[in-house]
Structures are given as C-alpha cells and as structure tokens.
Amino acid sequence: MNKTAIKNFAIWARNKLIADIQYRAGLMGITAEGIKNALPQSTPNMEFYDIGTAEPYSITGEAIQQRKKLVEILRQKEKDSDYATAYKYILEEVAYTWFNRLIAIRFMEVNDYLPSHIRVLSSETGKVEPDLVTTPFDTELDFTPAEEENILRLKTNNALDELFRLLFIKQCNALNEILPALFEKTNDYTELLLNLSVVDQDGVVYHLIHDIDENDFNIEKGGQVEIIGWLYQYYNTEPKNAAFAKNGKITKDEIPAVTQLFTPDWIVRYMVQNSLGRLFIDKRKNEGVFADGRGLDEMTWDEAEEKRITAEKHLAEQMEWKYYLPEAAQTKEVREQLDKIQQQSEYKDVRDIKVIDPCMGSGHILVYAFDVLMQMYEDAGYNQRDAAKSILENNLYGLDIDDRAYQLAYFAVMMKARQYNRRILNGETTCQVYAIQESNNINRTHLKYLGAGMDDLEVNTARVQVEGLLDTLRDAKEYGSILKVESYNWELLRRFVSAADAGDQVTLDSAGLEVTVAQLLTLIDIAETIAQKYDVVVTNPPYMAISNGDARLNEYVKKNYPDSKADLFAVFI
C-alpha cells in the first residue's frame, strides 16, 4: 500500500472538493460574505443571480427548492454561532459526504460488490467515461420516464459530466437500501452543491482512479478495507494541524480531528490477539490433556506451567497469531487466582462473546476483530456465511463521537462481512456500530404522544427513564464513551417510543413526531451500547490533556474520573 500516494490524494481531494463546492454555492449567491437575494427579474420558476458576467446565473425547478433548503440550514447554524462558522460547516459537511461516498464506491466497484456489477467511477476497459455512463440502462437503477429521457438527451449532447452527476446521485440513493448508514438519502443542498467531473483530469474522480493503485483496494490482490481508514486519517491532516496551531481550548467539534490516529496493523493485531484471542486460547488449552497424554495432576508444577505455555504457543501458531504472547510461568498461588479469573470470563458459546471498540475511529480494530471472531466461529463448526451474520448481530460493537468516522467504520465492517457472506448486503442485517448523538435538540413535548396502548405503570416508568436518558445524553459528543449511563429497561423503552400516536390531526405540538421517534430509538441503541458489559474492550484511546478541553469536559472528568483526570487516554483506561 503506497501511503504517500494515499496521503497526497486525501489532503488534495479535501481542498479540491471544498473549492468546487464553494464555487457552486457562489453561483447561487451564497458566499463567505453572506447570502444574496435573487435578481428582480426572477420568477417562481426561474431565479437569476449576479455572478459578475454579462449573463446572470440561473436555476430552475428543483434547484430552487434545494437552494431554499440550503439557506434555511445556514440560517439555523448561524443562530448557534455566526455566519462564517455556519458557512464553513456546510462546506466541510458536503465535502466529507461526497468524499466518503467516492472512496466507498471505489472500494465496492474494484471488488465487484456493487449490486449491478457495473463500475461507477471507472471503466473495465480503461475508457475515460465510467461504465455506468456508457451503459446506464444495464444497471438495476430504477429510472422514471423523465429521467430516461434526460439521460438520452445528455448522452446525445455528449454532456458527460452532467450525466455522470445524475447517475452518481442515483447510484448513491440506491445504495441506501443496502448500506443506509453511509448512503443516507442525500439532503437537497448536498446534491445541489455536487460538482464532480469525470472528464477533467484535475478532478477528484480522475485523481482517485489514477493516483492510488487499484490493487490497494482489491482484496483478491492484497488490498485491504483498511485503506478507507488511511484515507480518512489523511483527509483530516489539515483540520488537525489547524486545531493544534490555534493554541486555545479544543472545542467539541475539534476533538475528533485532534485525537484520531489510525492504528498501525501490527498494533491492532497485537491488541486483538492478546485479548479476544486469549479468550479462545484459554478455553481451548483447558479442554483436554496435554500432548504427551498426561493430565495436570500427573505433572510437577514446573512441568505443568511449561506445558501450559507450550499449549498456548501451539494454539497461537495454529491460528497464525504471531503477535500473541503466552502467559509467563506462575507460582501455584498466582495460577489459582488467574484460573478463577479465566473461569469467570470463559464463554460457553462463541455467540455470547461481546467485543467493543469504544472509540473506533474508522474501524480498523473492529475489522480485525471480525477476522479473529470468524476463526473462532469456524473452529466451533460454523460456516462462513452464518458466522458473518452472527458476528454482526451478536458479537461486534463500536462507538465514536465522529459522524464521519462512524460512516466509514460502518462501511468497513460491512465490507468485511461481505467478504465472507455474499448475501450480507441484502438490507436485512446491519452492524452495531454507532456515532454517539446528543439529546439537546429532542422535542420533549412529543413524549406525551408515546406509549399508546400501554398500561399506566409502564408508561410512567418509561417516561421517567426516557427523561433520565435524555438528561444523560445532553452534550454527549463532548464526552463520548466515557459517559456513565444507567442500565434502563431497554425493551420497555423501545416499546414505549415505538407506540407513538398523535391522532389523525397534525398539530403544532405533534408536528415532527416521526422524526423524534427515530431520534429516540437511535439514542436508545447508543445508550444501551454504552451501558452494557463486554467480554473484550479493545481500543486505541484518544490522547488529549483534559486541560485542553472546554469547561464542561473538565468538570465531568474531575467529577466522574478523579483518579485519571489528567488525560483522556487515562480516563478510558
């Protein structure tokens, strides 16, 4: 893997995407200085904007509504800070949205994981235009008659870039069915500001295809899904440097860029093999007699300890865990204590093991933990297809405060599952990784519409617990996985929230109830993941002096983690 090429592309691509998005927004009167009104000659069906040329720039139809949505979001963000911050936020948000989708689709097309098996960004035969542009109607994409007519018109006019953007958005929205956490239905303004080209040799698509060796994405040729994590880390290089350079307090929004560091592969393997792998080896080494046929009661203590170590080494070699370290020889007293601990953590069924990375970043540790779990399942007699599904449903968990990193961790884990199970991307199975969300904007007025049909005792209990949960998750992105969450009745809370009924008439009070229900169900999933116990916790924790955080983080850590209040890494330990 050529990490220099990956780094150079990711840093350059971020700046290029932001510049292109800024240009698109500027055409419609939205700049760093402010938001311009449409020119007087505008009509409800066509708006004109002065861009300093003889002819004004015009937008029509759906684009008018998309621009209105963009302005609405900017004004909302402006209230929370100022216009300059809101404008920068939009540029960064749209840029990372399309960057994440570009690199994900590149990985999928190279490994032939796309449902249509037709390349979206490149061509199997090396043409300039992607195969999707050449044969759009050979895909499984569902086009309306109007879209079909528009595609034919654009092909006739050789408007390749416009045609590509139309098809690329269509493909992203279609992938929502199988990878909803990454390919969310695009916001109106996200589509409006998309400015990708397949013809321009100085464009992001061209550089992605030509600057990074295709084999770095190709699993069959030594590529790894971990390339997604490296791309994301390098994408954040300049924001990270800027946060450090300002010499001030690190804000909530800056914590991810400042603290994320992609963990090298050998360190990941070392940590997972000596935690999750140790569970397996502890179980196996105690299941039978040793190689010479004698039981422990027939050996001297030194012989028994030597045999334990030999057995561990042998099992690790069988599993090809070269970073596994056998336990050192112990005295009888220490061994008895260790055996008690091991007996407490010994699992009866591989499906019962719970593994979490509480600050998962882009998922490197989770991806390798998936491989080790797969080995354990195969040893227990499972086939790979069933094992992959069970790992997603029962074993693997992840959390992070960064929405962008979460999307890529989710993608990486799902691609790892796809490696073992061709049918896993059917939309029926997803992974239990989450971006921690805050409760700050939950409309608590809607709680009175929840619990329809449930008895009063359950409703009252659930409402109290939901209120407590919302209080706990206020400003949750400030604290992340170090939050202390009570172990609520999760099944009750899910029933309570799902039983929403505001009647037939939508009122000012009940407007937006469906959104609140979806948000609450997500918060319940996140809170349960934080609250529950795990057999294995593996992570590369964030490294940041607490004194560099803001007052809320300082106060929370001092109150809840007084013995490790100096640095975030110590808090996680």
Model-derived features: where do they sit?
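Non-catalytic, mostly N-terminal accessory regions of nucleic-acid modification and defense proteins
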Residues: 1-292, 296, 414-433, 438
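SAM-dependent methyltransferase catalytic region
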Residues: 249-253, 257-573
